[in-house]
């Protein structure tokens, strides 16, 4: 019988993260510094509503306070910026996120730039991305951080390995490439995008393929070197359900892989909690267990 790839369980890994955070949250609460997460949601997109609700459930699970600011899709840019300003000043809020995407009439970059970098729970403020480039301490983007924790937790070699990252977006691909090339990781990274000629030529020589393109079943089995590790990050909602960037047939070729559901997604949410706790620790003058120099 053909051997199937080992499934990397993101739900289990996320639960381990949550378990470890409860102790840190309790320690902060003991000194009157209970962490708090704020969310700003503009519009009624079903996917965004679900994501935000899940983040608040996660907070309750580990003892983090959470605060919601929800607005209609017609909310003005001024109203959104006002909400950002309020959370910047709210002492109960250790960190917050603006749920993306925003309606077309709102300048996403203007809104994200208005977030206090010391309350940037998503790690997407230009200051924090700049800190990542310079290998300085700062908040890391949630999905790339979760990916590295998944790889380490499943004994996937990083240093010296050949990575192929499919997709160069600001939330996953580009920051992931930066994190993989830090001195603490020292991986060799190839970034491919929609303009790349013969993407498969790059993936077939990679030890680890990370697909973050948002194109259903993009990565085919013949793209993968036997025994490689393959992570599916992007998702596409269809009438048949949620599809990942990786064709399920890859399971017959890869050594380890994540499915569309229960893989990278749970770790992204867990890393948001971890970022909030670290922001609260930093504000309280407690040395965090991790920094961008050494952390996943």
From Swiss-Prot:
EC number in record: 1.5.1.5, 3.5.4.9
MF terms in GO: methenyltetrahydrofolate cyclohydrolase activity; methylenetetrahydrofolate dehydrogenase (NADP+) activity
Pfam family, one: THF_DHG_CYH
Pathway assignment: One-carbon metabolism; tetrahydrofolate interconversion
Gene Ontology biological process: L-histidine biosynthetic process; methionine biosynthetic process; purine nucleotide biosynthetic process; tetrahydrofolate interconversion
Coiled coil start-end: none
Keywords: Amino-acid biosynthesis, Histidine biosynthesis, Hydrolase, Methionine biosynthesis, Multifunctional enzyme, NADP, One-carbon metabolism, Oxidoreductase, Purine biosynthesis
Gene3D superfamilies to which the protein is assigned, alphabetical: Leucine Dehydrogenase, chain A, domain 1 (3.40.50.10860), NAD(P)-binding Rossmann-like Domain (3.40.50.720)
SUPFAM superfamilies: Aminoacid dehydrogenase-like, N-terminal domain, NAD(P)-binding Rossmann-fold domains
Residues that hold NADP(+) according to the record: 167-169, 235
GO CC list: cytosol
Reaction(s) the record says it catalyses: (6R)-5,10-methylene-5,6,7,8-tetrahydrofolate + NADP(+) = (6R)-5,10-methenyltetrahydrofolate + NADPH; (6R)-5,10-methenyltetrahydrofolate + H2O = (6R)-10-formyltetrahydrofolate + H(+)
InterPro entries in the cross-refs: Aminoacid_DH-like_N_sf, NAD(P)-bd_dom_sf, THF_DH/CycHdrlase, THF_DH/CycHdrlase_cat_dom, THF_DH/CycHdrlase_NAD-bd_dom
Similarity comment: Belongs to the tetrahydrofolate dehydrogenase/cyclohydrolase family.
HAMAP family registered for this protein in UniProt: THF_DHG_CYH (MF_01576)
Subunit comment: Homodimer.
Function: Catalyzes the oxidation of 5,10-methylenetetrahydrofolate to 5,10-methenyltetrahydrofolate and then the hydrolysis of 5,10-methenyltetrahydrofolate to 10-formyltetrahydrofolate.
Protein name: Bifunctional protein FolD 1
Gene: folD1
